Curated annotation (Swiss-Prot):
InterPro entries the UniProt entry points to: Ald_DH/histidinol_DH, Ald_DH_C, Ald_DH_CS_CYS, Ald_DH_CS_GLU, Ald_DH_N, Aldehyde_DH_dom, BADH
Positions with a binding annotation for K(+) 1: 27, 93
Pathway(s) the chain acts in: Amine and polyamine biosynthesis; betaine biosynthesis via choline pathway; betaine from betaine aldehyde: step 1/1
Any one GO MF annotation of this record: metal ion binding
Positions bearing Cysteine sulfenic acid (-SOH): 283
Record organism: Brucella abortus (strain 2308)
UniProt keyword list: Metal-binding, NAD, NADP, Oxidation, Oxidoreductase, Potassium
Quaternary assembly: Dimer of dimers.
Protein name according to UniProt: Betaine aldehyde dehydrogenase
Reactions the enzyme catalyzes: betaine aldehyde + NAD(+) + H2O = glycine betaine + NADH + 2 H(+)
EC number, as in UniProt: 1.2.1.8
Organism ancestry: Bacteria, Pseudomonadati, Pseudomonadota, Alphaproteobacteria, Hyphomicrobiales
Catalytic residues as annotated in Swiss-Prot or TrEMBL: 161 (charge relay system), 249 (proton acceptor), 283 (nucleophile), 461 (charge relay system)
Top-rank taxon, per record: Bacteria
Gene: betB
Length: 487
């Protein structure tokens, strides 16, 4: 299988190549096969992207918001028309099951474009009456914004970041993860087809040095990152030297709390969704599953039964429920955590190994894994693994589990399963996390903000809040009388 794009980069409305850049091979995670060969951006490529963005941004910002929104909504239509093609590309790029990419990737990107394209014309400033005189505020674009993506949801992340930025009148430069560089180029083509003026959405490929060059560029007004906490700290420090706006959507070790009155099958389904979807490579996953002692034994029994039925295999078989991890390095990292979990005394309830799959022996597969008898101090309960590894912990009462759930440097997400909605609201109100669910998990509609507390991030993706993060406020005071001056 091959998925070679026309060129590595997309700048000023056209594909651009510069083979002087460092080679960037693209690997299909299910087989280890190279499916494309790209090149990292050179300084010349980076400068060309900024020149194109600078040329286009002012005129774009001057358009009526409804006109900008119309182009975004047309882009959403194009993505939906091409959903199967884009989903197959995303499966090649990430290894995720086609069953998943058909509903969770380009489809979510289209939702974001449609939402921001529709809401931008109503996102206005304020009028303040001041007793004859008055003031008003304007929401204005920041200028050139940079997005740095992750490899778990490439096209979704590219759209979640670029849609609100473009809606507000900014230009956008996006660097995908070096592991998954392909679908951002497809998004660029969709923008072009929809009529987005050249230079407003640019894609530059590369490794960490390219990301650093974008962050440090004098024309960068804002940086939006989806990535790990260490990467976020580094980028925020770089951006802080020039006081640039930042949005950080980082890692997590989120709690999922199951009370003894919860619907057992629903809670197990939520826990599986919050640990095994995308082969566990989701930042908001509820990897610390706290189960009340009264139902712990039955919960684990049914969880193991259902987990063992997960179908692992060919990502392009729509019956497949779980594909491989993104890379050999990520697989080895996850396996090392499983080894550490066993060494520290956790009980391996199921999984923990590498499945034998005919035709995919060089792929980066791993079995969905459940640990029982996990304690709060174990490494697998403290550190983000980013793989299909669930830790089940026992609790006795509400106050106890709230305290333990909050005992983490992270605060991205949390979930509660209970038949008592009053208790559900109370517990969620005490949890220090930015994105929470009651009797559900990992549902992220674009209409609501997504982001975390503590080390899990700053700012928000999606919802009206995202528009605020891609804009700046200008206050205008209008004096209707004469100036009252003591001079």
């Amino acid at each position: 299988m091959k998925a070679q794009p026309k060129a590595s980069h997309f700048i000023g409305g056209a594909f651009v190549e510069d083979k002087a850049g460092k080679p960037l091979p693209v690997i299909y995670p299910a087989t280890g096969e190279e499916i494309a060969s790209l090149y990292s951006a050179t300084p010349g490529i980076i400068e060309a992207a900024y020149a194109a963005a600078l040329k286009a941004q002012g005129e774009w910002a001057a358009l009526k918001p409804v006109e900008r929104g119309r182009i975004l909504r047309r882009t959403a239509e194009i993505l939906r028309e091409k959903n199967r093609k884009l989903s197959k590309l995303e499966t090649l790029d990430t290894g995720k099951a086609l069953q998943e990419t058909l509903v969770a990737d380009a489809a979510s990107a289209a939702d974001a474009l449609e939402f921001f394209g529709g809401i931008i014309s109503g996102f206005n400033g304020e009028f303040v009456e001041l007793g004859g005189s008055f003031a008003y505020t304007r929401r204005e674009a920041l200028g050139i914004c940079v997005g740095i993506g992750a490899w778990n949801y490439p096209i979704q992340i590219a759209a979640w970041k670029s849609a609100p930025a473009l809606a507000m009148g900014n230009a956008f430069i996006f660097k995908p993860s070096e592991n998954t560089p392909l679908s951002a180029l497809a998004l660029a083509e969709a923008y072009k087809e929809a009529g987005l003026p050249d230079g407003l959405f640019n894609v530059v490929q590369g490794y960490g040095d390219v990301g650093a060059a974008l962050v440090n560029h004098r024309l960068t007004a804002k940086v939006s990152l989806t990535g790990s906490v260490p990467t976020g700290r580094r980028i925020m420090a770089q951006a802080g030297e020039q006081l640039k706006h930042v949005t950080m959507e980082l890692g997590g070790k989120s709690p999922l709390i199951v009370f003894d009155d919860a619907d057992l099958e629903s809670a197990i389904g939520g826990a599986m969704l919050g640990n095994f979807y995308s082969t566990g490579q989701v930042c908001s996953n509820g990897t610390r599953v706290f189960v009340h002692k009264n139902i712990r034994e039955r919960f684990i029994e049914r969880l193991v039964e259902r987990t063992r039925k997960i179908r692992i295999g060919d990502p392009f078989d729509e019956a497949t429920q779980m594909g491989p991890l993104i890379s050999a390095a990520q697989r080895d990292k996850v396996l090392s955590y499983i080894k550490k979990g066993k060494a520290e005394g956790a009980t391996l309830a199921c999984g923990g190994g590498v499945p034998k799959l005919q035709g995919f022996d060089k792929g980066f597969f791993i079995e969905p894994t459940v640990f029982a008898d996990v304690t709060d101090t174990m490494t697998i309960a403290r550190e983000e693994i980013f793989g299909p590894v669930m830790s089940v912990l026992e609790f006795s009462d509400e106050d106890e589990v709230i305290a333990r759930a909050n005992d983490s440097e992270f605060g991205l997400a949390a979930g509660v399963f209970t038949a008592d909605l009053s208790r559900g609201h109370h517990v969620i109100g005490q949890i220090k996390a930015g994105t929470c669910w009651i009797n559900a998990y990992n549902l992220t509609p674009v209409e609501v903000p997504f982001g975390g507390y503590k080390q899990s991030g700053i700012g928000r993706e999606n919802g009206i809040a995202a528009l605020a993060h891609y804009s700046q406020i200008k206050t205008v005071y209008v004096e209707m009388g004469k100036v009252d001056s003591p001079y």
